[in-house]
Amino acid sequence: MSSLAQKQVARLKRQTRVRKKITGSPARPRLNVFKSARHIYAQLIDDTTGATLASASTLLGDVAEGLSYTGNIEAATKVGAAIAKKALEKEITAVVFDRNGFLYHGRIKALADAARENGLSF
């Protein structure tokens, strides 16, 4: 198995281990984060109904404008601020953070810090 495949398997193991323990509710939805090499995505998910309450990513025009590259910490900070703004518009102030198996470092940490600075608590 290649080293890339080993990393992917390890991330999926971390993801399932964490997902067993956390769930989102209407009062406190799950803030799910996914990152690829070029983009970062965030969703607020109510696990009782399986519905996405709000989402933000670097694919959206308002987040991506002014960025020369969308796969860095600056872009993750903008996505964190955008998801916090959308959550506050829907009167959601508390969330459960789901790092989706990714290490809490770099872009994931930047997104979480920006969401906290803009009004979300977790």
Swiss-Prot record:
**Molecular functions per Gene Ontology:** 5S rRNA binding; structural constituent of ribosome
Transmembrane stretches in the record are none
Cellular component terms (Gene Ontology): cytosolic large ribosomal subunit
Q: Which CDD domains match?
A: Ribosomal_L18_L5e
Keyword tags: Ribonucleoprotein, Ribosomal protein, RNA-binding, rRNA-binding
Reply yes or no: does the keyword Nucleotide-binding apply: no
Q: Which InterPro entries does UniProt cross-reference here?
A: Ribosomal_uL18_bac-type (IPR004389), Ribosomal_uL18_bac/euk (IPR005484)
What's a GO biological-process term for it?
translation
The UniProt subunit note reads as follows: Part of the 50S ribosomal subunit; part of the 5S rRNA/L5/L18/L25 subcomplex. Contacts the 5S and 23S rRNAs.
Reported function: This is one of the proteins that bind and probably mediate the attachment of the 5S RNA into the large ribosomal subunit, where it forms part of the central protuberance.
Q: NCBIfam families, per this entry?
A: L18_bact
Q: Which family does it belong to?
A: Belongs to the universal ribosomal protein uL18 family.
Q: What is this protein called?
A: Large ribosomal subunit protein uL18
Q: Give the organism, scientific name.
A: Geobacter sp. (strain M21)
The top of its lineage is: Bacteria, Pseudomonadati, Thermodesulfobacteriota, Desulfuromonadia, Geobacterales
Gene that codes for this? rplR
